Amino acid sequence: MTKSNADLSAHTPMMQQYWKLKREHPDQLMFYRMGDFYELFYDDAKKAAALLDITLTARGQSAGTAIPMAGIPFHSAEGYLARLVKLGESVVICEQIGDPATSKGPVERQVVRIITPGTVSDEALLDERRDNLLAAVVGDEKLFGLSVLDIASGRFSVQELKGWETLLAELERLSPAELLIPDDWPQGLPLEKRRGVRRRAPWDFDRDSAFKSLCQQFSTQDLKGFGCENLTLAIGAAGCLLAYAKETQRTALPHLRSLRHERLDDTVILDGASRRNLELDVNLAGGRENTLQSVMDRCQTAMGSRLLTRWLNRPLRNREILEARQDSITCLLEHYRFEQLQPQLKDIGDLERILARIGLRNARPRDLARLRDALAALPQLQAGMQDLVAPHLLGLAKSIGTYPELADLLARAIIDNPPAVIRDGGVLKTGYDAELDELQSLSENAGQYLMDLETREKARTGLANLKVGYNRVHGYFIELPSKQAESAPADYIRRQTLKGAERFITPELKEFEDKALSAKSRALAREKLLYDELLEMLIGHLAPLQESAAALAELDVLSNLAERALNLDLNRPRFVEQPCLRIEQGRHPVVEQVLETPFVANDLALDDATRMLVITGPNMGGKSTYMRQTALIVLLAQIGSFVPAAACELSLVDRIFTRIGSSDDLAGGRSTFMVEMSETANILHNASDRSLVLMDEVGRGTSTFDGLSLAWAAAEQLARLRAFTLFATHYFELTVLPESEPVVANVHLSATEHNERIVFLHHVLPGPASQSYGLAVAQLAGVPGEVIQRARDHLSRLETTSLPHEAPRMAPGQPAPPMQSDLFASLPHPVLEELGRINPDDVTPRQALELLYSLKSRI
């Protein structure tokens, strides 16, 4: 805030009004309505000019200094708001609520809405296929309460999480646009690296206040019905969210009707690294192309796409729910029923967000037109669902229902193609309201009335030169030439004298004038009133309509998964109780879509006897693809989808871990190796015998000894944890693990050389790889020929003089004997080299003693 507001009395009346409002919102940009523009002043103007690339100018003076100013037309504000919200800014909308014609001094203004990244609901400001979440967290290092609100749909949830690691992983999954934290938390916390973190007063998270406000919001006496009455921290976070939402929206929130208690134990847990490595809905470059979501999403509605993304990011461990989804997909595939439903679903639109905007009372005419069309489409959709026999689909059909009365009302009320906003009218149909029709008729038919009046008056008076007209100053009038003015009837009242003419008005014309001049403004006011009444009536039906929207979104996702199963050759997986993961002819669902050649499918078999596969083979041979496809097949199975495999049998997993790829964390001061070890530590601490673990090239980034030792010990630990593990490595020494760990087996990706060039076969075969083909891969990558040849010479010498590939067998816990890396076995020690150069006959006793001490220090 600048010092310009220090003494309000020094400012002009208009700027005094501005500063009184601005003081309430010092950290937010204020859009201050002035006529047809939103103006920004002082620091806000400078900031907005830089962010939006708009002109910074100055407006007169106030308090003795020029006022920095920038403005945008109010009718194009949405585009600018979208850019600011995307940049993480919050904007205060300050509107004129007084009538300029009757105001003495500045027109009265007030803040009508605050737009923040986590509370936007306007269609133009949202990504239609992504959730836009507001989150709040409170607690200490041991236990956190987290609440999440999607104000654009009405979903509201709470959960409690143990430890920073779990909290940060959950925030990575949710990716909230805005995160509220207590102001008394220490500065520089890891989560503050996120965009959109806002600090709130500690008392905003008070549990007792939150409990009261939540009960009031849901019209309940307690929170037992939501299963969260004992979640003290989470309730505090939810109370903070509710207060913040009300503060920004400046209206009631009737579309927030319940609170969902989410439990980590119900889901497959993926940490942030695993989520990124698997590229579920964001690729490693930060885009959306070539992700699992991009391949699996052919949903007909935006709300269906958002639900599918939530499923992909939150796989389930509830076998009953998963098999109900599988049964639904099977049913939709029979007789290609999904093909009939999908075009009908397309007519539904984004019902979820339309209903939220109705609840927030900022729904636009086209929202109501889309709701009208959606409700009109429901009877035909229900007819298409009559043949569906899957119990879950029958339940969805019941929840969807039909709304003939609402559909009829909206069909009578809203014109076919309404304008974008209600401001200028023209939204409601003729015949919907008699008073509105009369006012609109007066406004629209004034010209015809005046022509008819002129004809009648000429006939009544016999004055052929009589004219009926209008001007803005004197309104409607009857004009007669001065010579005929004396012949005017008695009911003509003189209104104006002109050179050569007199103007009159009659009681009939005066009555019409009173109606006509106010008809347009009265028609607009009447239409706005009727529109608001229509919104209030729809708000009374929000609960069943929101239930219908949720069921329609799920039907869309299931129909989409049926379509994907047919067109991508996906098959139904089978869940079993006995721990196992068996995949026949599995494929990577994303890679096979971008390959120009057929994808090479592979089998995988893990069970109680074989818990780990050590995977060897050349770079580019397909090890990472094989590992990732396994994780994606499991993940798809545990959202209830069919999977890219000829057959799949699996037990439910509790976590999916991945240690794949290399990346540093420069901002966090962590090297590539440190990041790798942190991810490895997380896996070793948290994996269970129900987890799926993917480990790729553990130990690279440090010395050969250190890397091999760490990889070996990590593999042994995972074998003892009995987690289902795919362990890819270039350390061939690890291929002896099956001899000491019975639950470990070797497999390799096949390749061959032809004319000194490598050919990747991509088949997974039993046993370890025979060689790494590193030089062939380097040649394929374009390494210069002379470098390749020199490398062959070095390799030949090393292979001739190195120790054979074998490693001692150790029981768990047994200390490791000294081991020498075969890679450096042929290189003599520098001390030995120096000793070889010394002639003992040329050294004095003193020199020999000094040399001995020197050599000893170098060992």
Swiss-Prot record:
PANTHER family: DNA MISMATCH REPAIR PROTEIN MSH1, MITOCHONDRIAL, DNA MISMATCH REPAIR PROTEIN MUTS FAMILY MEMBER
Keywords: ATP-binding, DNA damage, DNA repair, DNA-binding, Nucleotide-binding
Entry GO MF terms: ATP binding; ATP-dependent DNA damage sensor activity; damaged DNA binding; mismatched DNA binding
UniProt family annotation: Belongs to the DNA mismatch repair MutS family.
Annotated protein name in UniProt: DNA mismatch repair protein MutS
InterPro entries: DNA_mismatch_repair_MutS (IPR005748), DNA_mismatch_repair_MutS-lik_N (IPR007695), DNA_mismatch_repair_MutS/MSH (IPR017261), DNA_mismatch_repair_MutS_C (IPR000432), DNA_mismatch_repair_MutS_clamp (IPR007861), DNA_mismatch_repair_MutS_core (IPR007696), DNA_mismatch_repair_MutS_N (IPR016151), DNA_mismatch_repair_MutS_sf (IPR036187)
Species, as recorded: Stutzerimonas stutzeri (strain A1501) (Pseudomonas stutzeri)
Record SUPFAM superfamilies: DNA repair protein MutS, domain I, DNA repair protein MutS, domain II, DNA repair protein MutS, domain III, P-loop containing nucleoside triphosphate hydrolases
Task performed by this protein: This protein is involved in the repair of mismatches in DNA. It is possible that it carries out the mismatch recognition step. This protein has a weak ATPase activity.
Any Gene Ontology biological process: mismatch repair
Segments passing through the bilayer: none
Entry binding sites for ATP: 617-624
CC terms in the record's Gene Ontology section: cytosol
